[in-house]
Amino acid sequence: MRAENVQLSRLFEGWDTYQISLVDAVEPLSRENLVWKANPNLRSAGEIAAHISEGRIDWFNRMGAPWSVQLIEQLKGYGSLDSIAEDAKELVKWLKLSWGMVKSNLDAWTTSDLWETYRHPYQGAVYAVSRQWTIWRVVAHDLHHGGELAVMLGLQGIPVPELGDLGGHLNMPPLAEA
């Protein structure tokens, strides 16, 4: 088999429709839906949505990804995205902005770019972290917290067919030929 240099947006196909599921889940929510907590120690649905956006921006900024610096600058005006956790329009705006940054990088990078590393200090050690590791970290973060969001909304009796029942999968694989 010949190794191909594939555009990352092709490799991560499906993540884009998961983003649509996140937006569709958050967009219709009221302030009451966004601030409700099942337990005082858990994040609210609004805090979860803000955390998803902030996680994307933070991790892509760590690897020096284009557009991340501009979003970090915009974030400074908020202090933290938790400040918008009660506003569905702002949450959707940041989900879309952070996804736009992710998508532009996935469109620009190919599989050969996955092995580029950056230095990341953590708990007294300095790690050589690859783009592959970081992108997988962000995918896992989106999926984990998207599931958490689905549960928080489900506990409130809010149906989330895309994010819940379909697991965020809006794109179906092609039908097999007979």
Locate each region found by the language model:
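Short, contiguous alpha-helical
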Residues: F12-D16, I20-V26, N33-Y78, H120-A178
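Acidic catalytic patch
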Residues: A108-G124
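Solvent-exposed, charged/polar functional surfaces in cytosolic regulatory/catalytic domains
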Residues: S21-D24, P28, L97, M101-A108, ...
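Helix-adjacent hinge/juxtasegments
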Residues: N61-R62, W67-D107
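Extreme N-terminal tail/first-helix region
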Residues: M1-G14
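Short glycine/proline-rich turn/loop motifs
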Residues: M1-R2, G79-I84, V126-Y127
